[in-house]
Amino acid sequence: MAEVMESVSTAVVPNSSVDWQKRCIALETQLMRFRLQAGNIRHLLAERMQELEQRVIEADQRAESAEKQVHIMEEKLKSANMQPSETENSLYRSYQELSNQIQEKDLIVKRLEGQLEKQNLVRAQEAEIIEEKAAKIKDWVTFKLREMETENQQLKKANLKQTEQILMLQDKLQTLLERPMSPAVDTHLVPSSPLHPPSCPGTPPAQEDCWRLPGCRLNSSADSKRKITEGCDSAFHSASLLPMLQDKADSPKSSQDGVDATSTVKESAEGVEPSFGVMRDRAMGGASDRDHSSDELNSKFRSQCLRSSSSSSSSSSSAYETPGPGGFDTPTPTPKSPPPVSLSPPLTRLPLSCPFPLALPLGTSMTLPKVRTPLTPRDSIQLVKKHHSQPQPGLERLHQVNVSIDIGNCGSPSCHSLVPGSAPSHGLEETDIDEGTPESMEVVVEGSEITEAQPNDGDLLDGLTKELEMMDPEALKPPTPPLHRFPSWESRIYAVAKLGMRVSEACLGAKTIGRVSTQPQHSTTGPFTHLIYKNISVPVYSTLKGKATQISSVPLPDDDSGSEDDSSSLASLHTSTLGPDKKGSTPGSPRAVKRGVSTSSISSESDYAIPPDAYSLDSDCSEPEHKVQRTSSYSCESVGPETLEKTGYLLKMGSQVKAWKRRWFILRNGEILYYKSPSDVIRKPQGQMELNSSCHIARGEGAQTFQLITEKKTFYLAADSPNILEDWIRVLQNVLKVQASGPISMDKEVKPTARGWLTKVKHGHSKLVWCALIGKVFYYYRNQEDKFPLGQLRVREARVEEVDRSCDSDEDYEAGGRGFLSSHFTLVVHPKEQSPTYLLVGTKQEKDTWLYHLTVAAGSSASLRVGTEFEQLIGKLLDVDGVSDSALWKREVLCFSKEGLRYPLTTLPSEALQTEAIKLFKSCQLFINVLVESPSIDYHTSLAQNALQVCLTHPELQNEMYCQLIKQTNCRTPHNYALTQCWQLLSLCVALFLPQHHFLWYLRQYLQRNADPRTEVGKYAVYCQRSVERTLQNGEREAKPSRMEILSILLRNPYHHSLPFSIPVHFMNNTYEVVGFDGSTTVEEFLNTVNQRTGMRKPQISGFALFTDDPSGKDLEHCLQPANKICDVISKWEQALKELHPGKYEGTRTVRLTYKSRLCFRAQAKGETERERLLLAYQVNDEVLQGHFPVSKELALEVAALMAQVEYGDLDRAAMSPVGSPQPKTQQTLLQVLERFYPKRYKQECSVEQLRELGERLVATKWSVLRGCTASECVRIYLTVARKWPLFGAKLFNAKPLPPSSLDRTQVWLAVNEDGLSVLDYTMYPLVTYPYQSVITFGGCKEDFMLVVSLIKDQALGKKTVDKLLFAMAKPKILELTLLIASYINYWTSSLPGASNQTQSSTLGAQGDKKLWDIDSRHFPSMTYTTKGPTLL
């Protein structure tokens, strides 16, 4: 067929134009399309058919369900049609029940409405009755008031009569006193002063016996008791009616003052005359008309007083009887005293209980403190009951004068009435209900004896109470308290607090002075103490212009400087700001002018005169001082002539008593002479200082003190202004040939790049010197310990070369007998425009080291081939500015190599350090190549700590450490755990120290190249960059990393946290706050974070500080200064713990940080936050618990209940059993309360049963009353009670006075607060207080604490004496006490208006801009490296 088709196609091709092949292809294409369309149609049709089938199935299912529902409905319909009656019955029953309930409710409502109407009627009737009673009471009150007014008029008339009688009695008394006395009687009339009563030491025995009076009994005991009762009764009803009447016979103006005296006596005689009448009637045995009238007046007065609601006067006078010389009794009024003189807190302890004489001679006055008169007798009854039931008043009466008034005659025992004086205000005073009321009716015996009441006091009080109750039964009813008063329980707490600021008598009686358990013993110093306190170097401070300025960083020896007498005149600079001292200037003798001394020099003897530094003996120095430019650095190579002589005033620290003395100094011929004044220059000098080559100068703290250190002594000197100080230092440096000032060489933070002994040759002169290259300056010293250089050489842009001395013939030249040939190698340093200096070096290693570092300092390292190959490549990178595409980065020397190091990568000055560098590389390899796992974590910790400690001990290896770690991480493949651990070790390094000079630049460039937040290595590089900046900002660390820091780096990814470390900060209320920090965080930054989280103020305002516990576990705490770094503190703490427990280190125990109050300022109390008040209350409670706060047993229970309410809230009443004893759970809570809030000394001698009774008493009378009181209210009340102690907020230190101290005590307390330093006895009674205005010098003196104070001996003449006090204490406590006093003094100095001006005027005033708390930071953690050679691993 195909053949036929071909033949046909061939036959017709020429005759036809149709292309059948294309036609066929087109048809086949159409066929394919048709097939596709047919397939699609079949597919769509199948889908449609499936959809229709599905619908059919669903329709069938719905039909079936509909049929089922139809069947169900049909069945229901059939059942409903079959039972219609049952449904109707159930509905009918429900209807009946609801109807019955409605009827019952209606009946109840009607019954209640009836009862309501009855109640309304009863209320209306009661209201009418009440109105009638109120009207009757109003009428009765009106009637009584009229009656009282009438009686008052009558009493005024009676007062006029009594006034006349008193005047008559005064005339009689004057007549008796003017008569000549016998010697026996004359001893009774010795004039006395209220400040020195006969009970005080020094009173004649005859006079002291007359005070006592119990010795002579002339009347019967019954009569005496009657007289005492009546006298006390009248005095008690008018507690403020003290003997204040003016003796008219003594005054020439009696006629003019008669009206005033009459008006005064009118008010006062109401409470005075009743006792007169009764006492005269019983004493004389007869009665006159005047006596009968007195009795009638007495009875009326009693009835009037017992029914009145207010006293008729606030100030009155009382009279009493004294035995006259004739044997009969004569009523003697007390003359009125002049206005009372305010008594400031004494500097010496005065007896507070001093009974006054029965009769005062003419010309003497007696000043008594005033008290508030009780409003009603029932108030007096309750006061008597309350004060008689409370503990006896003791030594807590700190700033008050307690007076005992004897009322009676020779035949009666004394009746004592304690009248409190007005205490001075101490900050925020809280007003309470008992303010001004008599606190006790007992005698307070001062001294070391225990307070005991007189035998008859209880009987007198009981008799007085019963007598008042019998006279007026209504007096037992308590009056309604006014609305403005505190709640009863709060008033009770304040009342107890007024008598409870003391140690209870039971506790004092059981202990002697020598064994008081509340005083801590001297603590021994442990390893952590030595680390944190720089080996306990106690500084010495002096008060200059009101500011505590450090004059020495070490304790002073006993006899340090000077030879003149210490009793000479003192400088008054320390009182110029804090106190208004007398500033008189007395010109010198006129003869001084004739001797050639200028008038300006003589007039400068004034305290604040500028010394005549312009009057130098050098005639060239005639330029005025204010035109001379002052600089802080000096050079011997100056063009002008050097000033080698000077005169002027300086302040000099005394030798025995460390006080400032103003002396006239003359510097001439290489020695210093000093005199008392310029007029004494013709006399023998008071002292002399020889200046030689071994002398040097050391600046003190601030800008006004310096030390002149000679071979034998150290002289402490101060100037009146910073400019004068700079002039003296300049001249002294010229004399001592010192060419550089102290700041650069004395800066311990700047580490020398290279140092060692070299022979310096210049201008043909050679000298063996100790050299140090610091930065770009080359310094040379006499010896290694010298702090001031002999000279300096600026190396920057200098030409440094090695001199070829192979042809020299003096190879055997030896230098200084030091055993090495210094002529082997020679270096020349040729600065621009200066002559060259030659350095002779002994060994090749030293030569290479000095050549490299000098070349780097000169800035020409790239052009010369010095240093190792690694250092040369870094120099080349520095020249090309470290471009990232430079081929130098991939040089084999800078990249990772599997082979170990054979030589150090940096230039090191000795063979030992080179060996140490190789061992350091091996240690790093062990750390890097061993995988960090839990079992081997301590292994890696030890490796890292040892390696980094070697770098801290030898700073020369720090550059080497960084070069090795960068080499180990650069171009290292593959990226495994070894690379990560190498970056972790680098992360530990950058937080501790940084490389120097161009190595630091290389580190920064390397970190920048690798910083990439997308990779793990890049994240570590970013973290290291942040650490480098933080280390540059806050300075380098002092201790190796702690275990906690290393574990945080190894186990936690530090790059995920901005603060990779965290530690809990504990508070006094047993709570804590977890705070984060990094490797460079200081305590100040750390506390800012704590304050933000807890809502507290800055430490400079609140007075809070951070403390650490002691690793030994002893009850010791160490205060951290703001400049300390948290990581250093933790590391030193762990190091001390390892030393205390060698071989068994507990990794679980960590340092405990506590945030609590260190300084307390009354002025800052107003802005206290709730959190601060809460923490302060818990801190005071801790002091109460430890026995550092005086509380009685009663007050201890009160404050314990307050703290229990704060800690546990309301006491659960359901927990109390019906009998009244607590259940076991409550009993356990009470034991916890007593354990946490009740003083330990009161629990020591208590048995278990006594503790249980104490807990029941706490619940029944104290804690249960506080129900509903919030924690903030309890804290407020607690602090109000605590602030009633005048020394609230003071820090107490246990000390032992040493001779020549006047304190004859074995142990005392030293209390430091914002007012000054107080010395307390073992009962915390103040013996003496030294305000900061009187403090001259304080700090360490040998092994003890020294305090030098200036006291005013004679107030009238203004004479001052200087006392030096020594106290034996533990060294850490001496340092803490010294820094605490300095902080308080400088706080007040900074708050004064002129303080800022003084700081700004200083040429070195930058140091004064530091915060107050930073001033003593250098005494805290700082490692001192004393190792001479390398410390091998």
UniProtKB/Swiss-Prot annotation:
Coiled coil regions, renumbered to chain: 40-174
Name of the protein in question: Pleckstrin homology domain-containing family H member 1
Keywords from the named record: Coiled coil, Developmental protein, Repeat
Pfam families in UniProt: FERM_M (PF00373), MyTH4 (PF00784), PH (PF00169), RA_2 (PF21989)
UniProt feature, compositional bias: Basic and acidic residues: 279-299
Alphabetical list of PANTHER family matching this protein: PLECKSTRIN HOMOLOGY DOMAIN-CONTAINING FAMILY H MEMBER 1 (PTHR22903:SF4), PLEKHH PROTEIN (PTHR22903)
Species this protein is from: Danio rerio (Zebrafish)
Residue ranges, compositional bias (Acidic residues): 557-567
Compositional bias segments (type: Pro residues): 332-343
An annotated GO cellular component: cytoskeleton
